[in-house]
Every structure is written in C-alpha cells, then in structure tokens.
C-alpha cells in the first residue's frame, strides 16, 4: 500500500495525502461511511458515490460473519462483488462488537467465546478466525483482532488487555503470512493501539504497534465515554509515536468538530455511525451548527435544507418539509437527513484537505469548530 503525503500544515500536525489500494485511491483526510452489514443504512450505492462522494466504506466482520455468512460471501467472490461496490472497503475485526456483548462472551488467551445477538448460537473468535473471515470478506483494509477495554478500566485490567491485544496482533500477522489473499487483490492489515486512558500504556502500545511496520495504524478504545479533552490528549500522544509515513486511523470518531480537531493532531482516517444514526433521529449537521429538525421552530421554515451544499437533497427539500416527514414518521425523512449528513461529513474532510494544501487549515478549523458545534 502506497501512502503519499502531499502537504503538511505549518501550524498543526494536519496533513493531506493519498492512499492507494487495488480498488482505487483514497484522498486524506477521509471519512468512511459505515456500512455494517454491507449497506450504509438508507443510502443507495449510486448516491454514496455520486452525491456523497464516498471513496471508501466500512463493513463489520462480526455482522457479516453472522449474516450473510462467509460461505455466501465466498460464492459471491467477496463482499465487493456481493454488494456490487467497486471502491475500497475497510472491515473492522469484530472485536469491538464481540466485547460489547458483555453478558454473553468470555475472553481467554485463545480468543472470545460469545453468543450471537441474533439467535443465541455459540461462536468463537480468535485472531486467526478473525483474519480467516476477513480474507473471505475480501476488504482492502483489514483490522487486527483486539480487545477494546471498557471505560473506565482499572490500570491492571487495561495493562493486561493491552498485552493481550499485542499477542493477538502477532497471531494475526502470522496467519496472514501463511494464508494469502483469496480474490486476487491485496489486503492490508492495520493493527490497533490500545491502553485505555493511561498515558504510559498508550505510549507502550503505540511503540509496539509502530514496530510491526504494517501498512497503516489505527487508534482504538477512544470516544467510548471518556472526556473529549482526554481523547484529544491520547490521540496526540499516540500520533507523536506512530510513523509519519503511514496512514493513521482513529476508530469511531466522531462529531464534525471532533474530526477537525483530530485532523489537526495528525489523523488521516475516520469512521462513525453518528451521521446516519443521528440523522435517523432528526439531527442535522451543518457548517453553521446543529439542527434538530423535530423542533417546532422549523415548522414554517421553507428555506432549503442546506443551500451551501450542492447535493440533490440539499437543493431540493425545505426544512419545513423534512420536519413534516419526521413528524409523520415517513421513511423518506431519515433517508434525506442520512444523505445530507454524509454529504456534509465528506464535504468537511475534503474542505480540510484543501485548507491544508493552501496553508489556511488552522485558522479555518478554529472558526469551523466553534460554528459547527452551535445548536441552532
């Protein structure tokens, strides 16, 4: 995997680059819409590429393993062919989802035994099993199997969990070395920095992850309930250690202002369910602030959803109409807001890229963070 950095910001650690995969290039900073089971909720593929301008989407190993299952994905020729998606895909390892099943899983050195949230059936994920499943799924970027400790975690638990993640990483690498790609294109492993909210553990984990010289590196276990400033602090500490010539992926983050602040810290890649999940509840992100479209103040507002954006939904529907759809519980309402929020997120990271390249990123970022976080 080639990652070329084209510009650095003079006043922060932000950078603009291009990541090359066998399914196409990805310009960074980038936001990856979350397509958990092979679809971004409520959004057509055509709109993902033509309206939202998505360059890569994210799939979930745990969910794709449970359904449709690896047998069907193998028959289809991998997830790209199954869903007829021609651009890059990243899959997480399933670790976060498995560990979120707190009452229905057991962690051992070997891996994690868990019960399906669908039918209660018993399953086991090991590092090797996660890599095997991700080979069958066939994503361009695959994540190492890790343990994501809950917040808060005591120091001893966090330390033991971090070391387990490191041992599991070695097993992931060993499996991939012995079991090559299935579908004729390259897959690239990103290991995950853990360490909970302990500075020394984060440093130790970042150093271990960096030593593996993988295609890129990820930061996990943040944005799980800790204070925002703590998330920024740990992100900066880790970015200071991870190699500058490899892409850095901050998992599960976040709000538009979180994303800009973390771009300034040196992060290149983001994913989050927030733009679509919040959209389904009527929350709309804009450059001027956050709208709750269900509020009565929008009942008679016939202005366009967002006249500053060129997407079809933004130039077609009024706030009053969208509010009407939500109040009537019409499915079109969440579809419109989901597309808008994703359009806005992709516009935001592309705008950040342009500001990095022209040398105005930090000034622009400071203005945007204040505006975007305002409740309208």
Locate predicted features.
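Glycine-rich phosphate/ribose-binding loops and adjacent secondary-structure elements
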Residues: 179, 188-305
């Amino acid at each position: 995997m080639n990652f070329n950095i084209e510009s650095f910001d003079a006043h922060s650690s932000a950078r603009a680059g291009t990541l090359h995969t066998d399914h196409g290039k990805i310009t960074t900073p980038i936001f990856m819409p979350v397509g958990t089971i092979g679809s971004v909720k409520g959004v057509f593929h055509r709109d993902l590429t033509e309206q939202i301008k998505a360059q890569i989407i994210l799939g979930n190993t745990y969910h794709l393993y449970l359904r449709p299952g690896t047998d069907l994905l193998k028959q289809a020729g991998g997830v790209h062919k199954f869903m007829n998606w021609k651009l890059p895909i990243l899959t997480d390892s399933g670790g976060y989802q498995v560990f979120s099943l707190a009452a229905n899983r057991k962690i051992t050195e070997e891996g994690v035994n868990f019960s399906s949230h669908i039918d209660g059936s018993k399953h086991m994920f090991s590092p090797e099993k996660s890599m095997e499943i991700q080979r069958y799924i066939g994503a361009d970027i695959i994540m190492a199997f890790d343990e994501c400790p809950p917040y808060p975690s005591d120091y001893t638990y966090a330390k033991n969990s971090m070391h387990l993640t490191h041992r599991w990483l070695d097993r992931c690498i060993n499996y991939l070395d012995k079991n090559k790609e299935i579908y004729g294109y390259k897959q690239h492993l990103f290991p995950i920095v853990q360490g909970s909210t302990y500075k020394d553990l984060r440093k130790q984990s970042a150093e271990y992850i960096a030593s593996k010289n993988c295609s890129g590196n990820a930061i996990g276990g943040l944005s799980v309930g800790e204070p925002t400033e703590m998330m920024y602090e740990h992100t900066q500490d880790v970015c200071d250690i991870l190699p500058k010539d490899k892409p850095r992926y901050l998992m599960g983050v976040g709000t538009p202002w979180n994303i800009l602040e973390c771009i300034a810290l040196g992060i290149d890649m983001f994913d989050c369910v927030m733009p679509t999940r919040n959209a389904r509840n009527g929350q709309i992100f804009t450059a001027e602030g956050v709208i709750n479209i269900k509020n009565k103040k929008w009942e008679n507002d016939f202005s366009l959803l967002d006249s500053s954006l060129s997407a079809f939904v933004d130039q077609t529907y009024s706030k009053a109409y969208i509010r009407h759809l939500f109040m009537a519980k019409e499915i079109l309402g969440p579809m419109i807001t989901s597309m808008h929020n994703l359009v806005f997120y992709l516009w935001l990271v592309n705008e950040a890229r342009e500001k990095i390249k022209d040398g105005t990123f930090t000034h622009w970022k400071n203005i945007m963070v204040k505006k975007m976080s305002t409740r309208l």
